[in-house]
Amino acid sequence: MATSAPELTDRLTWPGRPEALRMADLRGAPALLLFGCASSAWTRQRLDDMSRLLRRHGDKLQAAALIAPRFDAERDPRNLQQLQAEHALPFPLALDADWVAWQQFGIESWPTLLLLDAQGRERKRIVGAGPMAELAELVQALVAETPEVPARKKPAANGKRGLMPELPLSYPTALVVGTGKLYLADTGHHRILECDFNGRIVRQFGSGAYDYMDGGAGDAAFRRPQGLALQREALFVADTGNHALRRIDLLSGDVTTLCGNGEGPTQIGTATIDQPCGLQASASHLYVAMAGDNRICAYDLSRGALETVAGSGFFAINDGNGMFAAFAQPTGLALRQDVLYVCDAAGSAIRAVYLRDQRVQTLVGQGPYDFGNIDGPRSIARLQWPRAIALDPHDPLLWIADAGNDRLCTLRLGGGVVSGFSLPQRLHSPGGVACGNDALWIADTGAHALLRLDGRDGTLRHVPVGE
């Protein structure tokens, strides 16, 4: 027998809303109520699923999400602003900083989605990010059994502070440096930029629409692109929100899809394309950090085949060979000869994959729930939600965008230490780093900015992209 959902606690924070959402606001039509974490790839998949269902059913369906902090850094309500902008969410989000609502509703893991009927009664509880088709069928049945009601105002998104910032850049992430050019994933604006080293925009790839479309530079569309790799006249894009790998022909500007369909996670051969993030290109393969599937994959550029390199798919930090290893939401990659370095974001870890035998070794990190801000030998060093890495071209160093600690740090390869790198200004959840043209380029994601750290004199300057 369906029971009424409890009232929402007053201890929730609703950024940008004049007043808190109440359960009464979700009555009158079926509703989706999500419990998740902003850093969780599976939560983000459910948010996209909810948006698709709201567009499909219009006024006959409504939604809200209660977001709890997995990491200390996620206690900042501004994380919800980023979440709403990157996903173009049309419904309100609340921060459950002390997990009060989670306890109130008996939530045990993220994401958990409650399906409520028009009377506010819980009809179904779905744990995890399962197939969209299954969720769509359940929602369709719930909508079909609901009698027509007079038009009513649905709970709106979190207001202007929850919308895409009106700035030249919006939550930039991935970077790659070419000959005389810098390529940048302007993630919140759903586009890729080609710039000169002074920040002048030379070309834009993608219309900026939150969509999925191949075509010319101005017609193509992306959803939250978060990975880039350059190979001669081709720029590869990890189109995260579309679960797709895309290719930009730098001669014509045309955008095509290598694999994925823009709808959701898709099985392709022996691998699943599920929220691809980090990319690295070799002469023959495109390596992919598959954040939603906790695996490292390789796309054969000649055969057009996607294969798993390492990872069982389980959310964990386990070393081993190939499928016996486990990752925790990998988001960034760096490649040197036959070693692929992996930024394992949710595991707060840095890993190495030795491509000759697919052996995985943890360089920094102790487990998915062991994080902090500690420099020193690898055995004691701690990171918090690192999002990107880059290899120094001159020294055996790995640069790390330690997003959860708002800092830049280095790992000296070959058994060295983790060291925080002092900068004259604070970073804001940096989500991208790249080396090139005698500089380290930093995507200061939360500040909507691109920074350049000069490799010769150590000066840091703001790069005025599009300004």
PLM features per residue range, with description:
Residues 81-109:
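Short, internal strand/loop/helix patches
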Residues 100, 111-126:
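A short, hydrophobic beta-strand/beta-hairpin element that forms part of a small beta-sheet core
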Residues 152-173, 199-224, 254-277, 305-329, ...:
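Gly/Pro-rich loop segments of beta-rich domains
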Residues 22-44:
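Short active-site neighborhood of thiol/selenol oxidoreductases, capturing the structured segment around
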Residues 123-173:
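Thiol-/selenol-based redox modules, centered on thioredoxin-like
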Residues 39, 44-86:
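Structural microenvironment flanking redox-active thiols in thiol-disulfide oxidoreductases
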Residues 184-188, 237-241, 288-292, 342-346, ...:
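Conserved beta-strand positions in repeat-built beta-propeller and related beta-rich domains
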